[in-house]
Amino acid sequence: MLTVRHLFALAVAVGFATSCGASNRAGPQSPAGDQLNVAETFIDRLYAFDSAELNAMLGTAADSIPSISFYQGWAEGGHSQVVQRRPCEATGPQRVSCSITVQDDLMLALGIDFNVTDTFTLSFAEGEIASVATSSNALQVFWNAQEWVNEEHPELIGVPCQGMFDGGLTPGECVRAMVEGYARFAVSTDFPEASALLQPANRN
C-alpha cells in the first residue's frame, strides 16, 4: 500500500517530469523554424510594398536586391492582390519556398480568368537570407504578350522598362506600360484562339 509519504514523493516526481517536458517544448526554436519565420516575414514585407523594410531584410542578399525590388514595384504598380498565400515550406537544409497566388492588371488586360502563382525560393547562410530566386506558372500567352509588346510597341516600354527586373528605377511605370500593351495585344489579330489561352508556358 502506498503511504502518504510515497504519494507525495510520486506527485513531486511527476510534477518535475512534466515541468521538464514543458521546458523542453518551449526551448529554442530549430534553425528550420527560424528560417520559416524569416521567410514569412519576407513575404509580409514584399506585399506590404515598403521597399525600405524589404531591402533591410536583404542586406546579406545584395545580388537579389535589383530583381526583388523591381518585382515589388512591379507588383504594386500592377495592383497585385494576394488571392491565396500558402505557408512557406522548407525544401532543403538551407532553403525555403513560398508560393503566392495573385490577381493583377496584366491578366485582367488579357481578359483571362487565371491567377498567377509566383514562387520565391529563399536560400539561407548562417541564419540570414543569402539569395532569393523567383519562378512563376504564368501561361504561355502571358509571355507571348510580352514578346508582342516588345516587337510591336517598343515605344511604350523603351524608357520605363529599362533595367526590367534588374534594378530598373521605374517598375510601376513599366508594368503600367505593359498593361497597356497587353490590352492592345488582346484585341489584335495575333491574340490566340480561346482554346489556346490556358496553355502552360514552354520556357525551355
Report the location of each language-model feature.
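Surface-exposed, charged secondary-structure patches
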Residues: 26, 71-123, 196-204
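Bacterial N-terminal signal peptides
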Residues: 9-18
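Solvent-exposed, acidic/flexible segments
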Residues: 32-36, 64, 175
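Short, well-ordered alpha-helical segments enriched in acidic and aromatic residues
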Residues: 46-64
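Short, low-complexity N-terminal intrinsically disordered segments enriched in polar/charged residues
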Residues: 20-44, 48, 196-204
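Exposed beta-sheet edge and beta->alpha loop/turn motif
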Residues: 97-157
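Bacterial N-terminal signal peptides that target proteins for export
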Residues: 1-8
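Low-complexity, intrinsically disordered terminal/linker segments enriched in charged
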Residues: 132-204
